[in-house]
Amino acid sequence: MITSTGNAQVKQLIQLQKKAKAREERGIFLAEGIRMLKETPKERLEKLYLSESFYEKRKNELDLAGVPMEILSDQVFRHVSDTQTPQGALYLVKRSETTLEDILKQEKTPLLMVLDNLQDPGNLGTIMRTAEGAGATGIILSKDCVDMYNPKVIRSTMGAIYRMPFVYVEDLPAVLAELKKCGIVTYAAHLEGQHFYDEEDFCEAAAFLIGNEGNGLREEVAQAAEKKIKIPMYGKVESLNAAVAASVLMYEACRQRRRDLTKK
């Protein structure tokens, strides 16, 4: 059992919690909680860390034969955990690499989220979770978006991170041009949108662009989109939260496609 916060493994866990560079260099990320553990593909589990009390009371709940395991004292576990009320399970998970080509070659009609400089971990995790629920086929992120493997993002995805393909790209306008070549219409969520979002047809291949929480889409990214659309706003509110706006757009596409299928 590990009983000291000065232990080398404990220090590595804290590095993985706090530093995107450490996660990238090792090709792994740190996840936490029982529900996420059950969602994690077993072949991607590299190592499991359980609190002493969890191990004593609930070890028989888990089918983790063959997965390396360490027990941490409850005090050390609380030191490492990123949550206010730790559940008692931390684990190292191997990262999965996806390319833009992987996302575009799927047989399903493309429904993509394109995120420009999104910074809030909760927003990103919620968008990924909603994307899976709405039937999206992938997420494309500018290189300056928040790290997908940030612990707060991981928790917010509720397991969708294991199933929703995503890729970070260096040049977002160039990628938008590539999407156009593939017949995917790109829609920028923008205050200057020519049409309301529900006036467009999203039954064919589509990609929605969502920008930074405070500043929206960068001008060069907005200009690279084929169309600008807006969500109607009443009262004195100028715009919606990024994750809420993304959800509205994705579920409108989902609604249209479901309706279209019933007509065929």
Task: Report each predicted region and the residues it spans.
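Glycine-rich phosphate-binding loops that contact phosphosugars or nucleotide phosphates
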Residues: 91
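Short, structured coil segments at secondary-structure junctions
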Residues: 44, 64-65, 157, 162, ...
